[in-house]
Amino acid sequence: MDREFSETDVLSSAIFEPPLNSTSYESSCWRRRCVVAIPVRDEEQRLPACLSALAGQRDRRGRPLASDSFGIVVFANNCRDRSAYLARSLGGQFSLPLRVVEASLPPAKAHAGSARRRAMDVAEAWLGEERVRGGVILTTDADSRVSADWIATNLAAIDAGADAVLGDIALDEEGDLLPLALHRRGELESAYEALLTELSALLDPLDHNPWPHHATISAASIAITRDAYLAVGGLPRVPLGEDKALVAELVRLDRKIRFCPEIRVITSGRVEGRAPGGVADTLRLRSNDPDAFCDELLEPFRVAIKRAKWRGRLRWLRREGKLISNSAWARELGIPAPDAQRICRAPSFGAAWSAVEHKSPLFHRRLLKPTELPDQISGARRALARLRKGALAMREHVESEVVMPFRSMHPHSLTHCGDEQVCGLFAG
């Protein structure tokens, strides 16, 4: 993997390896298994709370983690304040193994995506230096505060088989100052996202990400194994949205992602942030324009159901080796035969599904306006109630006209019910 480092933009670095805190719980299983990467830009006001939360990490029994059980990388990029100085000072105060890298990035690279990639690259290299087996890279934001069991819960999910773990987020007390209309919109979006997430879990269940789970993708809480990080070539080189780009690449390679409901990070509710396109920009945009479009993942519920159902169908066909022999799926999705053949030859299901979404006219995304959310929520609730209640009947009823081409499919999956069963019944 090519690391984004050069002597032209790294001005200085300092490494701190303080002695063990005598009050910390020591266990050989925790010895420097993970490193937390934090990109920082002018965060002297919020960085102390971030590092304090990491200093207070405990295992799942509530015992303090040994101070040598994890490391922290602070990548201070283009800072005009005392962020780097404070990081060094707090590292000594909290007895944290801390590496502070100060960098002056050129304008073309002075963005959140590049800073986070560099921070995570330093974390990966640190694990490599110490030859850590099963090493894990975590990342959060300097304006965020993780829970006391954040590291332990992430590692538990990794130990359960995940290649990457995503945590949920909540706004801090600054979020209380946002307009009431924005809070109401946030409640509607959260409610609708939860409904779509459960619908997807029913129609395309994944063993490594069982229900319940969330669907939040935020760099405020990501954990990824070092092996997976190297496999995807590191954090994608994008100026913003690096968290979503990383998840997309993991999905493309069929890596196992757990959206862990037990992990929640408190992040800043400010509207003047440091990273263009980040949470602060989104909050400011929606405060200034209450009718701004919703996130692209909040699509009309009928399309979301169709997307999840077909994803589950095709996942099963590929797993059973029947994607090539059963060509009915391509005709129903409006995908030309040559494209379908290329999809069948894709190296992973994730790559195949990405091509399906690109080629099929059924899955073109339409952005929702916030005024549409109440009706979409009502429809999604009805659909979900039917799916929950009639799951057994739907599993047995797979001989409808729509699913006749799929008789050879597994009979015990909601993903093989026809469109009229999953969508059409919810019009009333």
PLM regions: where:
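Active-site donor/metal-binding and catalytic loop motifs
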Residues: 255, 261-277
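Acidic donor-binding loop at a coil-to-helix junction in glycosyltransferase catalytic cores
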Residues: 240-246, 260
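Conserved donor NDP-sugar-binding/catalytic core segment of glycosyltransferases
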Residues: 149-188
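A recurrent flexible, glycine/aromatic-enriched loop bordering the glycosyltransferase active site
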Residues: 200-222
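A conserved acidic beta->alpha catalytic loop
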Residues: 73-86, 105-107, 144
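N-proximal low-complexity "stem/linker" segments adjacent to membrane-targeting elements
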Residues: 1-69
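Terminal low-complexity segments of carbohydrate-biosynthetic enzymes
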Residues: 285-428
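Acidic donor-binding/catalytic loop of UDP-sugar-dependent glycosyltransferases
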Residues: 82, 133-135, 139-157
